[in-house]
Amino acid sequence: MKVASGSTATAAAGPSCALKAGKTASGAGEVVRCLSEQSVAISRCAGGAGARLPALLDEQQVNVLLYDMNGCYSRLKELVPTLPQNRKVSKVEILQHVIDYIRDLQLELNSESEVGTPGGRGLPVRAPLSTLNGEISALTAEAACVPADDRILCR
């Protein structure tokens, strides 16, 4: 997906399209884009199956919109774990999996809120990091007593 720098993209897209900096799991900044003015213009375009795009959109602008949409579908394929990775999937199938995944997440959230805490459903309660760090340091101290040849078995 094409990503422009923050200052030029805001100026080019106009005041109605804001850029928001988000954080990915790896910590790298990623630009999250809102709908561009062109896509808003397309969505407002009234008409049925024979409707034409507004005159303000030339072929290059339409190609840019399609490229951005393909990038969005690629991102969805990465984010949704239920999509099959070993074969090519259609855009409709991607959307169906996204909808199902969101529904599953909502059901999971609702079931947690009804029961209370995750530990109340039979799931183990997570230990605090201080407890885990203490256990790790105790294991490290014990490992110092073990001969170096036997330590490899503990990994």
Swiss-Prot record:
InterPro entries linked to this entry: bHLH_dom (IPR011598), DNA-bd_prot-inh (IPR026052), HLH_DNA-bd_sf (IPR036638)
Coiled coil: none
Stretches assigned to the bHLH domain: 53-105
Main location: cytoplasm
Sequence motif Nuclear export signal, residues: 98-111
Biological-process GO terms, alphabetical: angiogenesis; blood vessel endothelial cell migration; blood vessel morphogenesis; BMP signaling pathway; circadian rhythm; collagen metabolic process; endothelial cell apoptotic process; endothelial cell morphogenesis
Keyword Cytoplasm: yes
Keyword flag Transcription regulation: yes
Ranges that cross the membrane: none
Record-linked Gene3D superfamilies: Helix-loop-helix DNA-binding domain (4.10.280.10)
Superkingdom of origin organism: Eukaryota
Keyword entries, A-Z: Biological rhythms, Cytoplasm, Developmental protein, Nucleus, Repressor, Transcription, Transcription regulation
GO molecular function: protein dimerization activity; transcription corepressor activity; transcription regulator inhibitor activity
Subcellular compartments: Cytoplasm; Nucleus
GO cellular component: cytoplasm; nucleoplasm; nucleus
PANTHER family, alphabetized: DNA-BINDING PROTEIN INHIBITOR, DNA-BINDING PROTEIN INHIBITOR ID-1
Assembly and oligomerization: Heterodimer with other HLH proteins. Interacts with COPS5, IFI204, GATA4 and NKX2-5. Interacts with CLOCK and BMAL1.
Function as written in the Swiss-Prot or TrEMBL entry: Transcriptional regulator (lacking a basic DNA binding domain) which negatively regulates the basic helix-loop-helix (bHLH) transcription factors by forming heterodimers and inhibiting their DNA binding and transcriptional activity. Implicated in regulating a variety of cellular processes, including cellular growth, senescence, differentiation, apoptosis, angiogenesis, and neoplastic transformation. Inhibits skeletal muscle and cardiac myocyte differentiation. Regulates the circadian clock by repressing the transcriptional activator activity of the CLOCK-BMAL1 heterodimer.
Designated name of the protein: DNA-binding protein inhibitor ID-1
Organism this protein belongs to: Homo sapiens
Source lineage: Eukaryota, Metazoa, Chordata, Craniata, Vertebrata
Gene: ID1
